[in-house]
């Protein structure tokens, strides 16, 4: 027979969101990629009714299909095609959001070889239509993440068509650091709210 106490001691529990709000997130220690953390952030924004932003599916080129039965076609060979635009898009407070995400283990620069001409052209087209376009750059070794407006990326790319790396100093001068947290993990909408919709950014 189990005797249960009549007056159990109630412990004060701190809400998880409040408890971890300012805790720094280390993606490597958590076994999570930067992309996964952005996806988790977007899921948080969607669940809270803050924004609707999704990762665009990577296009696939089907090479060979097996038909063991008429009703069951099986793809046996395919490969990923190069994405023609950016990684993410959606809407926030009536504004179209479009951005790319890149990660590096380098400490002083972001390799520009990861950006392709068609992506730069797409970003320029988004800006022309008054959309909010940017890149999220994560320096894994430094544990630093930056929001770089698309215009700053385009300006640097046009110097030599993206043949050299973008110095971290340039990113710090022209971008904004994103303070990582728990809920959401990569709060990039804070930058948009404060610097763009708030009117601080020229």
From Swiss-Prot:
GO cellular component: cytoplasm
Keyword Cell inner membrane: no
List of residues binding Mg(2+): 85, 87, 100, 119
One GO MF term attached to the UniProt entry: nucleic acid binding
Cell compartment(s), UniProt: Cytoplasm
Keywords assigned: Cytoplasm, DNA damage, DNA recombination, DNA repair, Endonuclease, Hydrolase, Magnesium, Metal-binding, Nuclease
GO terms, biological process: chromosome segregation; DNA recombination; DNA repair
Reactions the enzyme catalyzes: Endonucleolytic cleavage at a junction such as a reciprocal single-stranded crossover between two homologous DNA duplexes (Holliday junction)
Named cofactor requirement(s): Mg(2+)
Intrachain S-S bonds: none
Keyword flag Ion transport: no
Superkingdom of this protein's organism: Bacteria
Membrane-spanning residues: none
Site feature: Transition state stabilizer: 102
Pfam family for this entry, one: RecU
Purpose of the protein: Endonuclease that resolves Holliday junction intermediates in genetic recombination. Cleaves mobile four-strand junctions by introducing symmetrical nicks in paired strands. Promotes annealing of linear ssDNA with homologous dsDNA. Required for DNA repair, homologous recombination and chromosome segregation.
Family, as annotated: Belongs to the RecU family.
NCBIfam families linked: PRK02234.1-1, PRK02234.1-5, recU
Name the UniProt record assigns to this protein: Holliday junction resolvase RecU
Species this chain originates from: Streptococcus equi subsp. equi (strain 4047)
